[in-house]
Amino acid sequence: VDYNSLFMKKEHEDPLATLQQRYPIRYHNPSRVPVQLLIAGNKLRIRFFVRYGKNMLENFPGTDVTYADIAESGIRKNWGGLYYFPWLADDGFERAHAKANVRILDNNEDPSEEEISPLQPSVRVTVEFVRFGSSTAASGFPKQQFYRVKLTGGSFFPAHVISPPWRWYWGFFRTLQLESLHLNWCRNHPGIITLQKEQDRYTFQQIAAHETGHLLGLGDAYGASYRFFYEAPGTGSFMMCHNRKVQSAELEMVFHSHMTNHMQYFPRKFHYETFISGLRREYQLQFHALAKNDRNRH
């Protein structure tokens, strides 16, 4: 089962529309929204208002680049780019681009419609970061709310996104999802990111991009304990499964999150053998982590 293909097939017969027409996302009070989707036609800018912990501004081992810079680079690389949807209409960009190509290549100042061949329309995504304390933040967004990113050197707890304690537990009754016990997501309170120190730069970037998916309003797709160790079918190549690549289906789930102000979750189910196998594997991993920490202390 290919989750991405099923997602696309479901919407293949929908009427064509630009991104702005299909998802007219607006924020009543933008200064209270730390992560914003800014849409014009088929152009999407994801703007992050971020406040880094002190150690995120330290240099990554073996480089003269900070953890924060490397994380931002990974998020831009993974979430930026072109995304294709079966319902997407051209906002004029592809037609204008095709017309300009004919003008230059064929020396034709006024090509006809038959002479131009626009490419398939795509959502064009760019990523922007506004850091707390920067001149941009001070001058352009003086009352803006920021989300926090922390860095830990411990290995017992993996990287995660969590809500402040006052938002714990009651979110379950909004979603009936175990994931929402400690991440009670909404646009005004997307969560606090905690990243782990990593030796490998690429791994750190991919983890940062995955955790950013939670910040944007996506649940996990991999076989986590709160998913009964059940991996959503057909999501092996997804960012929210194995930190691989952001798929169009994932981005569309983000649109739904910000339209509805509710986190979007991948399908899960309880399967006894899968659950027992996952529980055994989780115990072994925790045991090895504890043993490693004990050796490091001695």
Give, region by region, the residue ranges found by the protein language model.
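N-terminal low-structure segments adjacent to metalloprotease catalytic domains
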Residues: V1-A100, N296-H298
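Extended hydrophobic/Leu-rich segments
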Residues: Y3-F7, L16-L19, Y23, I116-L119, ...
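Acidic/proline-rich low-complexity IDRs
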Residues: S5-F7, P15-T18, L37, I104, ...
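Extracellular/periplasmic catalytic domains that process cell-envelope and extracellular macromolecules
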Residues: L38-A40, S139-K143, Y230-G234
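Residues in well-ordered beta-strands of folded domains
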Residues: R47-F49, R148-K150, M240-C241, Q264
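Short, surface-exposed beta-strand/loop "edge" segments at domain boundaries and coil↔beta transitions
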Residues: Y52-G62, L151-W170, K245-L251, F270
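Metzincin-family zinc-dependent endopeptidase catalytic domain
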Residues: V65-R227
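The catalytic-center signature of Zn2+-dependent metalloproteases
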Residues: T194-H298
